[in-house]
Amino acid sequence: MKLSFFGADQCVTGSCHCLEVGGKRILIDCGLQQGRDEVDNRSLPFAPGSIDYALITHAHIDHSGRVPMLIKNGFQGRILTTRLTAQLMSIMLQDSAHIQESDAEYKNRKNRRAGRPEEEPLYTVADAQRVPEFIDTCEYGQPVHLCDGVDAVFIDAGHLLGSASIRLTLTEGGQTKTIVFSGDIGNVDQPIIRDPQFFTGADYVVMESTYGDRNHTEVWSYTGQLAQIIDETLGKGGNVGIPSFAVLRRSAGLSGRGRSGAGEGRHPYVQFPGSASDGDRGRVQISERGPYPQGHHLRLRHVRRGPHPPPSEV
């Protein structure tokens, strides 16, 4: 057995680990390095065609953003992840590809003027659209047999819709070992995400440690402050703009606003950035079925594309 670290080692993005066991090569996550020049992402430190399986803990781009590069460069294996992560990846990776294409187009306009060679995008929308062909979805808590001597279990990590920690049970040379990859672990008592679950034992644990030295405030401790700011601003005839991550944070923010009663009678307008699948925005429904310890108060009533919707439709 051999474990190699190709990302999120001495840094916080680009999660990518490779486990070699029983003649098979298994990736756990394949994320983009973010906040650096793209040269860090252009070359993969392994031959994609040599990878048999890729297990994705969740859809955030720093954990899944180089999956289209795998496929573009010869990956022929299978991608295993949860159903909701698969759904989110199909949207987010196409948006990422749209950004890659736009960035390359912008740079190439400058390259042409300067007489420099043109650059290719890391991957294209067409590359990202192929990803679902390679995905097999897994259910939380249900063992999945990958190959001889390798079994996996995904459990809810409470970080994002579909996020998971993964335990691999590995048998080789008459010995059986378990190794857990935590993925990003969420906080407890979040408004629209279930609390994280935890494995009770493992021989080895590969732990994400971003924010690991920080004590988070309780989610509802700041909603009263937010409600006060919103009400005071609206009372003066103003508008409140709240920059937010598009995935989860925005939904959680709207949930907190609704639960606090802020801006009663006023309807929030959510502005989406440009998307590779522009025509599909507003028609995508992603939901986790089953009982929730919290979040049951949420109701999705109407989603509409386009400019500010009439109040009667919200």
Predicted regions and their residues:
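Hard-cation-handling environments
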Residues: 229-314
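Metallo-beta-lactamase
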Residues: 96-160, 261-292
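Conserved acidic residues
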Residues: 52, 203, 294
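Pre-active-site segment of Zn-dependent metallo-hydrolases
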Residues: 9-11, 21-77, 81-135, 185-194, ...
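Cap/insert and terminal regions of metallo-dependent hydrolase folds
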Residues: 78, 165, 178, 186-253
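Core dinuclear metal-dependent hydrolase active-site scaffold
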Residues: 1-49, 130-194, 284-289, 306-307
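Generic beta-strand/beta-sheet core signal
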Residues: 6, 82, 155, 182, ...
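Conserved structural-core and active-site-/substrate-pathway-adjacent residues in large, well-folded domains
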Residues: 3, 29, 58-59, 89, ...
